[in-house]
Amino acid sequence: MPVNALTNSFVLGAAGGGVEWGTVIVTVITFAILLALLKKFAWGPLKEVMDKRERDINRDIDEAEEAKLNAQKLEEENKKTLKQTQDEVQRILEDARVQARKQHEEIIHEANIRANGMIETAQSEINSEKERALADINNQVSELSVLIASKVLKKEISEQDQKELVDKYLKEAGDK
């Protein structure tokens, strides 16, 4: 029966023309068989494909969220590591500054100690030379005194001669 005839029979049946129950039953049975076949062969596999697709999409979303969380964790760890590195660099720089100051102070202290040592050595040498010079002068004065005394003993001299003699010996001592 063509589709137009089936439609006409329903329309006519509704209009009071009578329903062909055989056709209706065959149509309902055919429709039920078609639904059962669609459910078994099309709807089930289609539903499985749709469910699998839904699971895949949900899994992909979960993986994307997990990847996003991991990326955020890594970013936070990187920021923390960067901060720690910057803090470490600052600490190292501060330690270097402190060490440089200490070395500077030590160098100055050592230089002062050396300078003071050199000054003390120089003063000691100056004092030694001064004492030697005074000893030499005393020796020369002693020698002159002995010489003058021996000459005085050998001859009696006047005051004028004595002054000339002392001046002469002092001049000789100054030349030595």
Swiss-Prot record:
GO function terms (MF aspect): proton-transporting ATP synthase activity, rotational mechanism; proton-transporting ATPase activity, rotational mechanism
Family: Belongs to the ATPase B chain family.
Organism name: Staphylococcus haemolyticus (strain JCSC1435)
Gene responsible for this protein: atpF
Principal location: membrane
Any Pfam family the entry gives: ATP-synt_B
Official protein name in the record: ATP synthase subunit b
One cellular-component annotation, GO: plasma membrane
Domain of life: Bacteria
Role noted for this protein: F(1)F(0) ATP synthase produces ATP from ADP in the presence of a proton or sodium gradient. F-type ATPases consist of two structural domains, F(1) containing the extramembraneous catalytic core and F(0) containing the membrane proton channel, linked together by a central stalk and a peripheral stalk. During catalysis, ATP synthesis in the catalytic domain of F(1) is coupled via a rotary mechanism of the central stalk subunits to proton translocation.
Transmembrane annotation, as ranges: 18-38
Membrane topology (UniProt): Single-pass membrane protein
Keyword annotations of the record: ATP synthesis, Cell membrane, CF(0), Hydrogen ion transport, Ion transport, Membrane, Transmembrane, Transmembrane helix, Transport
